[in-house]
């Protein structure tokens, strides 16, 4: 068994630990292209509000009034080719939800859909909500999707949670 007589081994180990480590090389990933077709002059291409924003803003292509306590379909006049292996989730914009009680419904765009994209807006307030062409009305988030095969089984694997739902893990 070898031992260090003057501490050189431990000094070398400490120096190695404090040495500047090169970051692992990142493999450049080529992002898939989001192909978008404008169907009218009022259509606005989806855009992200910042470099790290998850969602692409979707804008109205028409004047629409969402009635108080009601809903309306707002056209974007866009057709979008969602990349294979993903889908687009159409989600509310936080500012519209907070300031005007505007929410989004039924927001899934499948990768094989090529028709015009419309956004269903729900107005949870007591006043009508006016939408003008160019207004940002929702955000579109591209998400990876897993589509497993369906298999009918006699029993499911047991879990600690079991059949508890609807608040069973706490409120």
From Swiss-Prot:
Pathway: Pyrimidine metabolism; dUMP biosynthesis; dUMP from dCTP (dUTP route): step 2/2
Reaction catalysed by this enzyme: dUTP + H2O = dUMP + diphosphate + H(+)
UniProt KW Cell membrane keyword: no
GO molecular function list: dUTP diphosphatase activity; magnesium ion binding
Positions bound to Mg(2+): 143
Assembly notes: Homotrimer.
Function: This enzyme is involved in nucleotide metabolism: it produces dUMP, the immediate precursor of thymidine nucleotides and it decreases the intracellular concentration of dUTP, preventing uracil incorporation into DNA.
Protein name: Deoxyuridine 5'-triphosphate nucleotidohydrolase
Organism lineage string: Eukaryota, Viridiplantae, Streptophyta, Embryophyta, Tracheophyta
This protein's encoding gene: DUT
């Amino acid at each position: 068994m070898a031992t260090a007589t003057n501490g050189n081994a431990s000094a070398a180990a400490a120096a190695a630990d404090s040495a500047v480590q090169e970051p692992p090389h990142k493999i450049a990933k080529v992002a898939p292209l989001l192909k978008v077709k404008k169907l009218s002059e009022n259509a606005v291409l989806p855009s992200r509000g910042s470099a790290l924003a998850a969602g692409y803003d979707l804008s109205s292509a028409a004047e629409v009034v969402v009635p108080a306590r009601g809903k309306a379909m707002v056209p974007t006049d866009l057709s979008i080719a969602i990349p294979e292996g993903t889908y687009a989730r159409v989600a509310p914009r936080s500012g519209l939800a907070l300031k005007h009680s505007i929410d989004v419904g039924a927001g899934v765009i499948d990768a094989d859909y090529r028709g015009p994209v419309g956004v269903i807006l729900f107005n949870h307030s007591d006043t009508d909500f006016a939408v003008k062409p160019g207004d940002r009305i929702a955000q579109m988030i591209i998400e990876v999707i897993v589509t497993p095969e369906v298999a009918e089984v006699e029993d499911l694997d047991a879990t600690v949670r079991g059949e508890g739902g609807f608040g069973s893990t706490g409120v």
